[in-house]
């Protein structure tokens, strides 16, 4: 091999055919018959979220280290991420595109981390002042009422909250055990909401006694009802009332109040929802042997899957296809509960197969306590003289919670029946937004059909398969010693590791692929976005192919 020759300048090079001019004179854009354009879609996770949180946005901001703006992105649609990050049934994860590649992003864990950061940094919260003279009344201080009050206050409306209990929170305080949702977290969220704007509170305000709907309607510009469901549904069987049988909701209320409970050595819980799981796990913490009896199978259980798995991990036994028919007592000792064996028949209105008796097959369980947790009921009687009701629920005319009276709105479980915390939060926000438009005369926002993507639109060549980062937790043995919170939350390293897994579906996250790969140098990289230089883009669509997240679409030239 010959000696290496180094040229200090092109002038030292021997004569050869070469070009030292640029090609800007050649407007290759004239060759184009299709043009690319940046086209941001709605990520599937956001479409799955009942509060429509901009999940892609706040996870991207986490990867950038901008926690304050990430928290503010959540607060736009959900004022209590510290709570929903702990107790939501996270349908967003079911929609997460990454689950079709490896495992869904742990969205609730990221949401919880940001929610806790927001509580630790109260200066992040916008402190709204009263800018409107119209006063709004909110009845109930559960998730729907708190959400409605927050978003009304953020618009500048003075809000008065009426709560029958001695403390705010509703189901957040009394219906969810501390090992899932610590009282301290509830207290901090409520304090944050009350400090966010012109909100005053009146506790011990009992409907029909201290306040009435017709009076509030006269005194306030608008009223929102978010009282939730307050009663356990009865089973309607012989012996249901009496010693040895207790409503699940009442038991949870005692536990959350810190009262001493002793359900006995053997306990059966009837039901398959989250309340049943909560009651069973609280009873285990009292030292009881617990069996949950459900009339359908595991597949039909309405409880959050994670809660079922946690209950089993803590030693709760599950017995399926059985329903209680009678309860017998002899003195003050254990009770005998007779169960009918069931089988699944045709689907009912919920889409689940209806349980029907399996002939004459029965069995008996002898237990110290039976807890009933077959659902909750509302009480619409305080409102039926003023607005239309539907049995034990309030009738509404839209997702915004409008009732038969134009100034009265309702939302949450008192409208839908038993649902979730996050759905109640969404109902409260939508009602607040509608009330604001009603009082200002603003028009309704135009409805747009959201465009989204699926795994087929993701260029997975740019991603490595990784496992979801799990939230650290205490062991089952340690958990049963008390009501300490089970999941301890992400630290900064785990938070970033999980956020970095996000595909950022349909939304540019400035990865530079289009800028790097464009053969015509027709992508201009600006401070906060990219632009196509259509004088030189010849429509080769390399940018579309190499975009990892389908944030670029195409349009036929001339259209």
What residue spans do the PLM features occupy?
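Ferredoxin-type iron-sulfur electron-transfer modules and their immediate structural context
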Residues: 1-135, 183, 225-241, 329-334, ...
